[in-house]
């Protein structure tokens, strides 16, 4: 058995083509395109790279982006004031605060200051709560991207046992709730779970989101399972030992090229949706 490759890069490219048409139609109708505002506080090179990648994705689909750069010394109040300014700007349809922010800033307060209708990265507590309750809200970009990838490849979720290894507020926790809302039976584990192997051994779907290179071993995973690796570490490895699973899993996300492209794609996807709602 050769595992089906859940190709996030290919799906992201296909989606970008569709989004380009939607943006062009909106521009033809209104003379405007959606605008994503990205906020970068400080000079962290990795964060700057991520912000640039998001801006490039906007450019590829013909959508505008607004880059807001603030100094490392920015205070919580100063960042809150900038977010309020963007909330009140009718030309801005999505707001992304690049994580992490400098330690003197209350990141949670700043995330929660983002207007719900512009929370296209799915980081507010209100958005998380609405998502958990099955109400309309933009999902956290990575888990929402995973759900879109599973849907595109018609991976059945209803009644399946999904084990999510990881509990971060922007990945593990929302991932578990999205799977639950799709009628999967969900077990949440993490790096301190006792006898982790026994939980994973029963899983129809395994999601690695623990942030430790190849923490989840291939021989823990049962034949025919669907394997989703949301990790990425130097050397091109994820959170799961993927090599031996090529002929054991029924489907898997490659690293790189699986989950990663879907994260930025989902941010752009939700930004276009927000723009359509506000401009159409």
Curated annotation (Swiss-Prot):
GO BP annotations, alphabetical order: L-histidine biosynthetic process; methionine biosynthetic process; purine nucleotide biosynthetic process; tetrahydrofolate interconversion
Pathway: One-carbon metabolism; tetrahydrofolate interconversion
Signal peptide: none
InterPro entries: Aminoacid_DH-like_N_sf (IPR046346), NAD(P)-bd_dom_sf (IPR036291), THF_DH/CycHdrlase (IPR000672), THF_DH/CycHdrlase_cat_dom (IPR020630), THF_DH/CycHdrlase_CS (IPR020867), THF_DH/CycHdrlase_NAD-bd_dom (IPR020631)
Binding positions for NADP(+) per the UniProt entry: 166-168, 191
Tree of life domain: Bacteria
Keywords assigned by UniProt, alphabetized: Amino-acid biosynthesis, Histidine biosynthesis, Hydrolase, Methionine biosynthesis, Multifunctional enzyme, NADP, One-carbon metabolism, Oxidoreductase, Purine biosynthesis
Molecular function GO labels: methenyltetrahydrofolate cyclohydrolase activity; methylenetetrahydrofolate dehydrogenase (NADP+) activity
EC number: 1.5.1.5, 3.5.4.9
Coiled-coil annotated spans: none
Catalytic activity: (6R)-5,10-methylene-5,6,7,8-tetrahydrofolate + NADP(+) = (6R)-5,10-methenyltetrahydrofolate + NADPH; (6R)-5,10-methenyltetrahydrofolate + H2O = (6R)-10-formyltetrahydrofolate + H(+)
GO cellular component: cytosol
Family annotation (SUPFAM superfamilies): Aminoacid dehydrogenase-like, N-terminal domain (SSF53223), NAD(P)-binding Rossmann-fold domains (SSF51735)
NCBIfam families in alphabetical order: PRK14192.1
Task performed by this protein: Catalyzes the oxidation of 5,10-methylenetetrahydrofolate to 5,10-methenyltetrahydrofolate and then the hydrolysis of 5,10-methenyltetrahydrofolate to 10-formyltetrahydrofolate.
Similarity comment text for this entry: Belongs to the tetrahydrofolate dehydrogenase/cyclohydrolase family.
Description of how the protein assembles with itself and partners: Homodimer.
Protein name per UniProt: Bifunctional protein FolD
Native organism: Teredinibacter turnerae (strain ATCC 39867 / T7901)
Lineage, top ranks: Bacteria, Pseudomonadati, Pseudomonadota, Gammaproteobacteria, Cellvibrionales
